[in-house]
Each structure stands twice: as C-alpha cells, then as structure tokens.
Amino acid sequence: MASFNNVLTKAAAGRLCKAMGVRMVANPLVVQLAANAGFEALFIDLEHSTLSLADASAIACAGLLSGLTPLVRVPYQCGIGFVQQALDGGAMGIVFPHIHTAADARAAVQTCKFPPLGVRSMWGQQPALGMRVTAIGRIVEVCNAAASSVIVMIEAASSIENIEAIAAVEGVDVLLVGCLDLSTDMGMPGRFETRAFRTALEKVSAACRHSGKTMGLAGIYNNRELHEWAINTLNVRFMLCQQDSNLLAMAAVDCASAVAKIDRARLLN
C-alpha cells in the first residue's frame, strides 16, 4: 500500500498533488467526498482543530483504502511520541509547522524515520503495509522510503532567511509555505499581491529547485492568479487546495443565497 504515496510519485513525475484539508469533519466518510472530487491526498489538521489522534487514524486509514495519501499536521512542538502515534495510526507523512532553521528540519526527519535515518520506535504492523505482520527489515525499508514523508512548513521571515539550509536537509520531502502565517509574520497579513511576499515565495522555489525538493503551497484557497503563478512559474507540486470547513461555509452561503433570490414572499416584502 505504501507504493501509492501520491505526494512523492506526483512530484517525481512533475505533476501536482492536490490535497484537501480535514479539520472539522471527524467522520471518515469525508474521505469518499475528497476522492470523488479528485483530490490525491488528505491534509488531516491536528494543529488548528479539535480532532483527536483517534479521529486522525480513522480518516488516514480510510484514505489508505481509497488511494488518497494521508498526511497529518501535528501541533507545534508536540514531541516525538505524538508524531509516533500519528504515523502508527496510518499517516504516510507528517506536516511540521513553524520550521525556522535547518536544525528544526533535521529534528523533524529524525522523528519520522526508523534507524539508521532517525529515532522512530518500531511497531511490527503498519497501516501503510495493510496491518500485515511484516519482517522488520521490510518495514524499515518501505516506511523510511515511502510512508514517512517529511513536510516542513515555511511560515516566518526567519524561515525565508534560512531557506537554503532548510531545503538542503536530507530527508525533507516538501517545503510547504504557510501563506497566512508567513504574510502575517512579514507584517503584511493576507497581502499576497505584494512584491515582498512574492519575492519570499520565489526564494523558496529557488531553494527547492537547487536541492531537489518539492515546493508546496497552503493557506491561499481562492486566488486563482496566485495559484497559476505558483504552479506554472514557481513549480509548486503540492497544494493544500481547500479545507472542509471552508467548503461547507461557502456552500452554505451559496445555497441560502440562491434560495433567497427565488423567494417570492421575500421579494414582495
């Protein structure tokens, strides 16, 4: 099952991996909606939500069975044990928020990988391998290569200053720009059109190209101009396209508004 890490295979083929964020809906049926829509990955958010590790595991395992690569964003400085539980629960990759330095990135890799690449503790049945009892050597080989992706979030001006060193860390797969936090930290919250913000993204792109890493984008959901520029010019190959809560909110507004427009009683009053 670990062979379908869409984050890695899409990037290797020069194609975009589209992720849907899950931060509100705990029911694993949300995975079927994501699959029907055409997403290839799940971004299960334990940083900005009240979802539990048990919720994350259920959603991740549903993703594994549906061909969607499950990623879990863990809370900042959550500790090795929390990351271990997320991986053992079915995550094929961990999203680490607020990575400022190369040392932060190296610590993230160490946490996710089995020895000799890291310090992750061994468990002999992995969801990414179908929960089959598997030879330990095989678990190490498969999980280190394809079922423990390391996604580090670039969310501060200090991260941009250290971007070349962060991108050079062996074992990091994706540098994911958190646009909301980054623009806020730069003193221009939500002003994605500014030259300074665009320059920061260009620096991430250059560092990724130089080190052979994948650039990702998160936090900008309805700006098609920026999406087009990021994908086709900056070579973004992983994108958090939307969150379940945003999709529900927008659909609810659209539905109520559409019905209100044809409500004759309302028009007469």
Swiss-Prot record:
The keyword Oxidoreductase does not apply. It holds the Pfam family HpcH_HpaI. One of its GO terms (molecular function) is aldehyde-lyase activity. Pathway: Secondary metabolite biosynthesis. Its EC number is 4.1.3.17. The record marks 88 as: Increases basicity of active site His. The keyword Iron applies. The record marks 73 as: Transition state stabilizer. Binds 1 divalent metal cation per subunit. A divalent metal cation binds at residues 155, 181. One of its GO terms (cellular component) is cytoplasm. Keywords: Cobalt, Iron, Lyase, Magnesium, Manganese, Metal-binding, Zinc. Substrate binds at residue 181. Its cofactor is Co(2+); Mn(2+); Zn(2+); Fe(2+). Gene3D superfamilies: Phosphoenolpyruvate-binding domains. It catalyses: 4-hydroxy-4-methyl-2-oxoglutarate = 2 pyruvate. The active site is at residue 48. Homohexamer; trimer of dimers. Belongs to the HpcH/HpaI aldolase family. 4-hydroxy-4-methyl-2-oxoglutarate aldolase; part of the gene cluster that mediates the biosynthesis of the tetramic acid Sch210972, a potential anti-HIV fungal natural product that contains a decalin core. The PKS module of cghG together with the enoylreductase cghC catalyze the formation of the polyketide unit which is then conjugated to 4-hydroxyl-4-methyl glutamate (HMG) by the condensation domain of the cghG NRPS module. This is 4-hydroxy-4-methyl-2-oxoglutarate aldolase cghB. It comes from Chaetomium globosum (strain ATCC 6205 / CBS 148.51 / DSM 1962 / NBRC 6347 / NRRL 1970).
